[in-house]
Amino acid sequence: MQVLHVCSEMFPLLKTGGLADVIGALPAAQIADGVDVRVLLPGFPDIRRGIPDAHVVSRRDTFAGKISLLFGHYNGVGIYLIDAPHLYERPGSPYHDTNLYAYTDNVLRFALLGWVGCEMACGLDPFWRPDVVHAHDWHAGLAPAYLAARGRPAKSVFTVHNLAYQGMFYAKHMDDIELPWSFFNMHGLEFNGQLSFLKAGLYYADHITAVSPTYAREITEPQFAYGMEGLLRQRHLEGRLSGILNGVDEKIWNPESDLLLASRYKRDTLEEKAENKRQLQIAMGLKVNDKVPLFAVVSRLTNQKGLDLVLEALPGLLEQGGQLALLGAGDPVLQEGFLAAAAEHPGQVGVQIGYHEAFSHRIMGGADVILVPSRFEPCGLTQLYGLKYGTLPLVRRTGGLADTVSDSSLENLADGIASGFVFEDSNAWSLLRAIRRAFVLWSRPSLWRFVQRQAMAMDFSWQVAAKSYRELYYRLK
């Protein structure tokens, strides 16, 4: 079984979000599981630099100009790169310029990604041809459409990491991307009069996966589907929509071997975690005190992530004696709010605006509770890292958060399945009640330790996801 992942980023070469973490870990787990997996990426400068051994496999004239297909390896995974400097070699992010304006030729830049994904199934590399083309998010959404236009030379899977990003472009661009105009209708890639790369992936793929079972159910409902609920409900009824939970890359996220921690620890040596807390309190300007619970946030500061709720609930958290350490950036209003709280409560609130991968490890190792109060969360990796590090996740019951964290209710404690704190409603009152439950459990140290050990024993390795994907691929054959 030969599988080609088609996507726009891969950790650690290039990362703007959780998609990169998935592509950085899943292919290696699949190779270990016996699947012949390779990855296709645009030749962005950071990616090119990370694969210096890449050599030319093929050259083509395309609708987007002359390109070369390169092949190299990264950490044992075969990587194809689309070498098209006129499209990909630019400053700024992969998607927008330094002024945060989307590149005007994004329609060509990412149509080309899907086109090359399809051409791989038609023999673009004469020595390797995929049985399954596995496309990720809107950037790769046209791959299943091109495969459909070419008579489906390979099966296709389309994974939705976040349905909110839809890859919308003017209809006139159908003339530029070498897809038949017959595809531009409601039973195709048309959406609200425009061309949607996301809908192309959803409509033409042989199977759709979401990154958690709960998110797969949620996206059939209007409040989560952004207008795609009719199509997704139909795919669900056809048995062509499922949820496969993301995993944790244990080579990177493991408190037993994490060199970024002041003190490494495991389930049986949880007392070693205390030094990480002390160091984190010092680093964030918090009062050094192991008797109070330290709550943490590592997140983009947006309303989708529920960070406005944290700001609203913060006085209640502080009144009960808790501390807050926050690492993140985003909405200027939220940034100002948290910075003001840090100024008003020195020693109790520490804020660092920005994102630093290394510091996020130190927070995960040092905090007692990690807050993930998202309004929607397709999978979420932060809560999985929290579970792995014995930093109990406090989450809202949505998407992957609902699938991975069990509330420390009396019943769950009795059954030995409690692993964190879960609240239902998207409001500060509901969040505060969960925070209150965290304080109650904190006051019972032996129970807290019991829940930590339970959380750390859970298996969210990529091997589990790799097995589920393998079973899906074989069902499609």
Curated annotation (Swiss-Prot):
It is an enzyme of class 2 (transferase). Keywords: Glycogen biosynthesis, Glycosyltransferase, Transferase. ADP-alpha-D-glucose binds at residue 15. InterPro entries: Glyco_trans_1 (IPR001296), GS/SS (IPR011835), Starch_synth_cat_dom (IPR013534). GO terms for molecular function: alpha-1,4-glucan glucosyltransferase (ADP-glucose donor) activity; alpha-1,4-glucan glucosyltransferase (UDP-glucose donor) activity. GO terms for cellular component: cytosol. CDD domains: GT5_Glycogen_synthase_DULL1-like. Its EC number is 2.4.1.21. It comes from the Bacteria. It catalyses: [(1->4)-alpha-D-glucosyl](n) + ADP-alpha-D-glucose = [(1->4)-alpha-D-glucosyl](n+1) + ADP + H(+). Pathway: Glycan biosynthesis; glycogen biosynthesis. GO terms for biological process: glycogen biosynthetic process. The keyword Transferase applies. HAMAP family: Glycogen_synth (MF_00484). Belongs to the glycosyltransferase 1 family. Bacterial/plant glycogen synthase subfamily. NCBIfam families: glgA (TIGR02095), PRK00654.1-2 (NF001899). Synthesizes alpha-1,4-glucan chains using ADP-glucose. This is Glycogen synthase. It comes from Salmonella paratyphi C (strain RKS4594). The lineage of its organism: Bacteria, Pseudomonadati, Pseudomonadota, Gammaproteobacteria, Enterobacterales.
